[in-house]
């Protein structure tokens, strides 16, 4: 029996998981997505082509790899089908869980209405409907992909759902969809997606028993986890390593090596606490150097320095075996590089993540910068100050930086 390798984000998402999944997918038979929706995105550069993936696992770019979308995902059929159109020959290479929940256009309408109602207290969601779709799942009124294979049953459920929820739609000022039109839309989705829908839990057990090499990929990052993140400024799913089990039907003994992904600095999209955010010129420089604009929304990302306190928290929560440090080259040319090494909280210095990050202040340690790391493919090729920075981060978080990325290109990756 094999064990599945796991990739998980350690910050607030957008860490660069796509490049590492693409890199590791070259040696794996299956790549499996366990949570999230199309609010998150991977950007992968191969040669002169750039791929933006939101729902399809990154293994799709390896013609030998097969791809699984697990039951922990909420899937927008419209957006998924659009994403499928980028690729040929997906049949036999793509498997969608019949237990994954369907995200429909009215979920996005509700999401956006809620954000408007909150005013300056808005969370800053992508407005894609992820929260309402997960809300329906937890409230036991959601619709699952397997129901697309049984149109009559799905139709009766949708009619009953709208009858029950009409007062909710009216109260929020959201126009309720026309039932017949929605059912016709779903029938179109069924024709495209039906060949890919199956019991992926049974598939996962089978490929583990067959000793296949399996890679599990999450979405977003630990600090956006519904339980362990900066609640309520979080996503609605489990983004940490434990979510791979519930989101794919695995047990903890099925999990092998855990690789955590982190940038050499920090970014965040949307509202919520961000202790090491730099609101000045250096934050702007990080954003420009790193092209920090959302894959899904195009929104500029908030930028700041590496937060070693939050990183230690994430490493422990996820049981990380090694860290992949991304975008080291974005720090090229800085005279000084800061790292948040502790927080000031209620008049005291602390080295852990408290209940609420809103009121903490960062305590920084400065490191000398370097001229160039871009394109380096060997650790010894890095400037001495860059190597010292990496070794210092390792000591702070208690885990080895086993992979270091020095550009968006697939080949510009250091393996230690």
UniProtKB/Swiss-Prot annotation:
Native species: Sulfurovum sp. (strain NBC37-1)
Catalytic residues as annotated in Swiss-Prot or TrEMBL: 14 (proton acceptor), 42 (proton donor)
Catalyzed chemical reaction(s): IMP + L-aspartate + GTP = N(6)-(1,2-dicarboxyethyl)-AMP + GDP + phosphate + 2 H(+)
CC annotations in GO: cytoplasm
Enzyme type, top EC level: ligase
Pathway(s) where this gene product acts: Purine metabolism; AMP biosynthesis via de novo pathway; AMP from IMP: step 1/2
PROSITE patterns, A to Z: ADENYLOSUCCIN_SYN_1, ADENYLOSUCCIN_SYN_2
Protein name per UniProt: Adenylosuccinate synthetase
Source domain of life: Bacteria
Positions that bind substrate: 295-301
InterPro entries per UniProt: Adenylosuccin_syn_GTP-bd (IPR018220), Adenylosuccin_syn_Lys_AS (IPR033128), Adenylosuccinate_synth_dom1 (IPR042109), Adenylosuccinate_synth_dom2 (IPR042110), Adenylosuccinate_synth_dom3 (IPR042111), Adenylosuccinate_synthetase (IPR001114), P-loop_NTPase (IPR027417)
GO biological process: 'de novo' AMP biosynthetic process; IMP metabolic process
GO molecular-function terms, A-Z: adenylosuccinate synthase activity; GTP binding; magnesium ion binding
Keywords: Cytoplasm, GTP-binding, Ligase, Magnesium, Metal-binding, Nucleotide-binding, Purine biosynthesis
């Amino acid at each position: 029996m094999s064990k599945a390798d796991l990739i998980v984000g350690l910050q607030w998402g957008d860490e660069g998981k796509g490049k590492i999944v693409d890199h590791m997918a070259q040696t794996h038979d299956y790549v499996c997505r366990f949570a999230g929706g199309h609010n998150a995105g991977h950007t992968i550069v191969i040669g002169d082509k750039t791929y933006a993936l939101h729902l399809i696992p990154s293994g799709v770019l390896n013609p030998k790899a097969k791809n699984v979308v697990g039951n922990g995902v909420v899937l927008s059929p419209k957006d998924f089908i659009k994403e499928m159109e980028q690729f040929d020959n997906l049949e036999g290479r793509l498997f969608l869980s019949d237990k994954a929940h369907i995200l429909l256009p009215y979920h996005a309408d509700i999401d956006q209405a809620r954000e408007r109602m909150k005013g300056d207290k808005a969370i800053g969601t992508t407005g894609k409907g992820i929260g309402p779709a997960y809300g329906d799942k937890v409230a036991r009124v959601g619709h699952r992909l397997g129901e697309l294979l049984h149109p009559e049953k799905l139709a009766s459920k949708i009619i009953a759902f709208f009858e029950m929820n009409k007062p909710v739609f009216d109260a929020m000022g959201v126009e309720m969809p026309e039932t017949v039109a929605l059912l016709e839309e779903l029938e179109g989705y069924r024709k495209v997606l039906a060949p890919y829908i199956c019991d992926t839990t049974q598939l996962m057990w089978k490929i583990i028993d067959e000793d296949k090499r399996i890679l599990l990929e999450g979405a977003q990052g630990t600090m956006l986890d519904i339980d362990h993140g900066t609640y309520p400024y979080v996503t609605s799913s489990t983004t940490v390593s434990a979510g791979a089990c519930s989101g794919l039907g695995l047990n903890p003994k099925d999990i092998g090596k855990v690789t955590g992904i982190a940038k050499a600095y920090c970014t965040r999209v949307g509202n919520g606490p961000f202790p090491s955010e730099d609101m000045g010129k250096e934050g702007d420089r990080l954003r420009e150097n790193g092209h920090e604009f959302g894959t899904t929304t195009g929104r500029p990302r908030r930028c700041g320095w590496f937060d070693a306190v939050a990183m230690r928290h994430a490493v422990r929560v996820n049981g990380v075996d090694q860290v992949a440090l991304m975008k080291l080259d974005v720090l090229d040319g800085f005279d000084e590089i800061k790292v948040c090494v502790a927080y000031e909280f209620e008049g005291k210095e602390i080295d852990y993540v408290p209940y609420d990050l809103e009121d903490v202040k960062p305590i920084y340690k400065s490191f000398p910068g370097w001229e160039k790391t871009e394109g380096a493919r060997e650790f010894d090729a890095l400037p001495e100050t860059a190597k010292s920075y990496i070794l210092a981060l390792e000591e702070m978080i208690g885990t080895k930086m086993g992979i270091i990325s020095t550009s968006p290109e697939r080949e510009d990756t250091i393996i230690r």
